From Swiss-Prot:
Recorded catalytic activity of this chain's protein: shikimate + ATP = 3-phosphoshikimate + ADP + H(+)
GO molecular function terms noted in the UniProt entry: ATP binding; magnesium ion binding; shikimate kinase activity
Residues that coordinate or bind substrate: D33, R57, G80, R132
InterPro entries: P-loop_NTPase, Shikimate/glucono_kinase, Shikimate_kinase/TSH1, Shikimate_kinase_CS
Protein name (Swiss-Prot/TrEMBL): Shikimate kinase
Organism encoding this protein: Helicobacter pylori (strain HPAG1)
Pfam families: SKI (PF01202)
Keywords from the named record: Amino-acid biosynthesis, Aromatic amino acid biosynthesis, ATP-binding, Cytoplasm, Kinase, Magnesium, Metal-binding, Nucleotide-binding, Transferase
A GO CC term attached to the entry: cytosol
Role description: Catalyzes the specific phosphorylation of the 3-hydroxyl group of shikimic acid using ATP as a cosubstrate.
Length: 162
C-alpha cells in the first residue's frame, strides 16, 4: 500500500477524513500544515503574515520530498495549496475531496475562517477555488464527492482502495 494523500480546498474535510481513515486502516496520520506549523513554531496564519506565502510554499515543497522517503504508508492530510507543487506527483494515491464553494464556506464558521489567511476575502477565495479545481482534478487518483459528509467520504475512499 502507498500513502493515501487527501487533497482539496481548505474546509473540504481533509483533516477529519484523515483521522477516520487512519483509525479504519490502522495507519499513522500526518497533516502537512500541522507539521510545518510545529517545525516553524508559528500557526499557518502567522507563517503567512510574518514569513510570507512564498516561504510557506517552500516549507511545503520540502516536506513533500521528505514524506516520499518514508518507508511505511501513511494517511496524509494536505494544505489546500499543496497541489501547486510538481513534486506532489508520486507521493501516493491521491483523493480529491470535491465540494462546491458555497458548501465549503457554510461548513466553516467565522473562527475557522479566521485561521485560514486565504479566506480573508471571499471574492478572492472563490477565484482561487475556481483556479485550483482543475489542478485538484488533474492530480487526483480518485475524486470523492465530499458533499455527503464524513461517513460518506470515508466509504468512498475505502471502496476505491478495496
Amino acid at each position: 500500500m502507498r500513502h493515501l494523500v487527501l487533497i482539496g480546498f481548505m474546509g473540504s474535510g481533509k483533516s477529519s477524513l484523515a483521522q477516520e481513515l487512519g483509525l479504519a486502516l490502522k495507519l499513522e496520520v500526518l497533516d502537512t500544515d500541522m507539521i510545518i506549523s510545529e517545525r516553524v513554531g508559528l500557526s499557518v496564519r502567522e507563517i503567512f503574515e510574518e514569513l510570507g506565502e512564498d516561504n510557506f510554499r517552500m516549507f511545503e515543497k520540502n516536506l513533500i520530498d521528505e514524506l516520499k522517503t518514508l518507508k511505511t504508508p501513511h494517511v496524509i492530510s494536505t494544505g489546500g495549496g499543496i497541489i501547486m507543487h510538481e513534486n506532489l506527483k508520486g507521493l501516493g494515491t491521491t483523493f480529491y475531496l470535491k465540494m462546491d464553494f458555497e458548501t465549503l464556506i457554510k461548513r466553516l464558521n467565522q473562527k475557522e475562517r479566521e485561521k485560514r489567511p486565504l479566506l480573508n476575502n471571499l471574492t478572492q477565495a472563490k477565484e482561487l477555488f475556481e483556479k485550483r479545481q482543475a489542478l485538484y482534478e488533474k492530480n487526483a487518483s480518485f475524486i470523492i464527492d465530499a458533499r455527503g459528509g464524513l461517513n460518506n467520504s470515508l466509504k468512498q475512499v475505502l471502496q476505491f482502495i478495496a
